[in-house]
From Swiss-Prot:
Gene label: prs
The protein's name: Ribose-phosphate pyrophosphokinase
Cofactor detail note: Binds 2 Mg(2+) ions per subunit.
Pathway assigned in UniProt: Metabolic intermediate biosynthesis; 5-phospho-alpha-D-ribose 1-diphosphate biosynthesis; 5-phospho-alpha-D-ribose 1-diphosphate from D-ribose 5-phosphate (route I): step 1/1
Subcellular location per the Swiss-Prot or TrEMBL entry: Cytoplasm
Binding site for Mg(2+) 1: H128
Catalytic activity: D-ribose 5-phosphate + ATP = 5-phospho-alpha-D-ribose 1-diphosphate + AMP + H(+)
Organism: Baumannia cicadellinicola subsp. Homalodisca coagulata
Amino acid sequence: MKLFAGNAIPELAQLIANRLYTSLGVAAVNRFSDGEISVQINENVRGGDLFIIQSTCAPTNDNLMELVVMVDALRRASAGRITAVMPYFGYSRQDRRVRSARVPITAKVVADFLSSVGVDRVLTVDLHAEQIQGFFDVPVDNVFGSPILLEDMLQQDFNNPIVVSPDIGGVVRARAIAKLLNDTDMAIIDKRRPRANMSQVMHIIGEVADRDCVLVDDMIDTSSTLCKAAEALKEHGAKRVFAYATHPIFSGQAHANIKNSVIDEVIICDTIPLNSAIKALPNVRTLTLSGMLAEAIRRISNEESISAMFEH
């Protein structure tokens, strides 16, 4: 087994390597003077079981191209098997044509791209839509960040907690968390989204008054939805609001939104690196998925079950 990393998430890649008691492979991933990506593998990988750790977060296209160029370099160096470890899978929200609009299904384009350059397997975390696994012609292991989030929740001193889904689509996730969080109650926020990256909270289904609310979602983008949800919960009498999510995209006005919000704490995972402004916010805390991803990589390399990691 050998691990390689692009430039997207070097800190997480190093943590994973540390967990596996190994070092990252020797590779130079740079840029030519015109901006094109330059990759050179500086060690023997012939016949090796190789893992490339690279989230396709912003800058999405650069990180995606780094990944596929690294795959091609390793494939041409006679790699035995290549697994793309993508903690965050970019373009995952473009997974369907809503009302047959004239738009691409970009998640499928990316899946085809990865397959065509020689990826043998994909390991990712909390795909925005699980059916994206079917877009690939190679096996996809979609592991979950919820055990890491749940472990943190169980360590908190919540006062009469209630798990809250920020929308109808997140009900299954919220219900699973609520069951494992001592079978606590659940609430749902019904919202209307007038246009992309904008949302308006409509009403809350469930009783949140005098309770600590635990919002759970797969990702936080501009955080507009999250902050308005927190406002609605506080208006309905919630004592405190905690927001848990796997992927901290934090684009656009996310920093200002969170800084000025009524959210008591935002807890996210390290699938995407945070900028310095977000890191400086006192109510943002990061959990690492390095242990879980290291175990998944070990199991893949040893041909062991991934699903067994999540059997309760």
